[in-house]
Amino acid sequence: MSSQANLATDWRAGYGPIAHRSETIERMQALVHRLVAQRRIADEASAHALLAAADRVACTAMSVVAHMTYARRIDRSGRPLGSDDFKQTPEGHTGGSLDMVPAFVGYLLANALTGTTRGWLMGQGHCVAAIEAVNALTGDVSAAQRGRYDRSEAGLSRLIADFYSYAIDKQGRPAVPLGSHAGPNTAGAISEGGYLGFAGLQYVHTPLPGESLVAFLSDGAFEEQRGSDWAPRWWRAEDCGFAVPIMILNGRRIEQRTQIVQEGGAAWLAEDLRHNGFDPVIIDGRDPVAIAWAIVESEDTLSAFAAQSNRRYPVKFPYVIAETEKGFGFPGAATNAAHNLPLDGNPREHAQAREAFNAGAAALFVPEIELENALTVLANHGKNRRSRESEHPMARRHPASPHLPVPAWAPTKVSGSAMSSLDRWFVKLAQANPQLRVRIGNPDELASNKMGATLALLKHRVNVPEPGVPESTHGSVITALNEEAVAAAALANKGGLNLIVSYEAFAVKMLGLIRQEIIFARRQKELGQPPGWISIPLVVTSHTWENSKNEQSHQD
């Protein structure tokens, strides 16, 4: 299709199970006009070609995801698979991964439309098959995967066979560069995503000024982890990059519908978000074009706010509700079974399941030449002089080592408070490193823990400071009676300087989040990719040997 009119018709028609609602078409057409007027893209024909390409890449990636669960190989000619082509024991979080494909391809589309590479964060790490399938198709794989996974039939078949193969090398470590969750071998990943709710706590603290992040969130995590609704309370244009949260609202957990759907679905969630300072928008989560539109619009909203000279906080923070069904685009969608194995039976052993699989794969099939053209169109990195998605800045954090002031050592045989000494030294550390953004995770006890000077210097971050209290609109101390939420602020700030202070017993609530960070960092070191961020101290106080003021309530 060479004419602009044909290109427009082509993308509007959708592809396979992907259809574009009239609302999505109108929204994207308006955005394309604006991008052309702002010279962010050359012309409408270029934009339309990208939109059509995204549909085809998404369909192919969804097919690869289904194959990763059930099959031993893929046939890129589209021929149906026989019984021996299927795994004896299929495994994979298929439904969520299928839903993540349009979302992740929509993220790629947004980058291609605007000529900028954003970072990404996925809370539902068990949906890694979606990322790996798309990365293999685009060729944007990690160093360990290079030469093993690509978009050839052989390369995709290796990816498919390796998934949940449980292969172990002679050292007892995974023998293939592919895991059940996002990891350092997942190109561009910055978090394991094993705990669904932690991405919702971290995303607003992750990008530095000048950066942009897209965070894919789980609707199941909405009921698992509290604290994500405070993002508008923490975001500041002066020291934060842009962040776009996208909830994949597929409505199902493992055994039943999510609480959101039971309460009223997307409309109910949108109302709840408005009460917490968000500006939600509901889109078609089955459509990569809708995802891309929402990303660009949300980012532009934050950019317009940042350009104002008379900013007042909190900002009405954009929040994207991507409404879909569990396992979209494949047989078994919208059922509880879609969470893991959507087909009714193993295709290796059951003819009916095999027929359903082959029919589902056929509906998603994209001919080789058409797929190659689509991938070439999306790969405009060189043309726009932008990095590949795996090289986004948040995936390559290496801040310069901080200047470490000499501590004011206390003379021997003189009693004193260790916390007070730490307090004095941390003040000097923060003052000596103004180039590093500081985040203090504080569950409301910093002064009680004898760090009053640190609090006086850095201050609680609030929207409206109270006179006479160490508070500031731009404070660096993230304070809330939620240990995970405040620890997340420090752990997400990998381009800066961080500290977490808590009572011993309360610190236990942070262990899941800290465990996830340690696992990811440990795997990076094992793979010869040691993390470059500055170590984050976690100080716990009120030990049993220290005092008995609160008995064992504040102690372990």
Task: For each feature predicted by the language model, list its residue ranges.
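Glycine-rich ThDP/TPP pyrophosphate-binding loop and its adjacent helix/strand module
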Residues: 179-372, 546-556
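Short internal beta-strands
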Residues: 121-123, 241-251, 441, 538-540
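Thiamine diphosphate
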Residues: 170-244, 293, 448-556
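Non-catalytic terminal/interface segments that mediate subunit docking, oligomerization
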Residues: 52, 66-74, 120, 375-532
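Cofactor-binding active-site loop characterized by glycine-rich and histidine/acidic residues
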Residues: 50, 55-80, 88-91, 96-238, ...
